């Protein structure tokens, strides 16, 4: 490659480029992965989903606990008074209005946890898409920087040839040397950034992130224009609604728990040494809790505070969800329009750069004009890469904040 046959003055810069390119490409075979494969791996093995999954298990366990009946208590005793042997069974009575309220609290909490987990899965998909898009953008910038470094090397050799032929000055050679060195350093930095972005994709997938093991199979494309918001309640809002319903049910349970559940006691007495009371003597009892010393005020106040908090969080979730969707849709529209204009600008800037280089080879224009034309071409293509990445990120954000429970 011509970009690696450098003059002695530029040997250190070219060595940096060569090392960076080896790091970016990798010395071992890398498995190509598509965007969908990265998303699937993130959902199956990613850290975000793994951290969110236990919450749903805990909520399901809470619902199982709420539905369970209390175990009876068996007791046995001995007394000197007749009858001397006593045995009893205490059976807690789960009142229907307390049981139903308790189960409703746990059921709504489980619904909220399930919806939050669905939102976390959507967030994991969003993170994977964002990481993949960022890696594509960094890889495109690295390729652009490498091409720019090679073009700058060619321009330097052209300036040296024209100087040796008497058609250019030493100033042109020095300007070309500075330009080539700067672009070589930029290529090295962009190559390192591309490797870092690729390792971030591996981390999101749940893979080791110490060395590149994958390659990007997709390319940066303009997202489709059909980013319609699906019908239904967004996942984040639905989870907040379930939390609010659970808090309402918890407050109702606290009010109903002023009278705690009673318990029924059944037992027998036996063994009268005098023989006055032969056989077994049945006993029966009913234990009731009367609110004489407290009316469950602390629990009621705490439940009321949690209800107010849940309602406030629901209001915030609704407002933030609406704002996030609107902002993401605006960002998508702006980035898509900019990408369309960038394509036309890139074509024009490339033509200007090619024409200026040809004119310099013929001695028709000065070297600074060529450098400026190439700089504008680099910036135009760099803006196109950034705007395509921004459009893809905005499309992912629209999907994240508008996903509903029925979204596939």
Predicted regions and their residues:
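Transmembrane beta-strand segments that form the barrel wall of outer-membrane beta-barrel proteins
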Residues: 69-80, 99, 260-271
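Periplasmic alpha-helical coiled-coil/stalk elements that build and connect Gram-negative outer-membrane
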Residues: 121-233, 238, 328-331, 335, ...
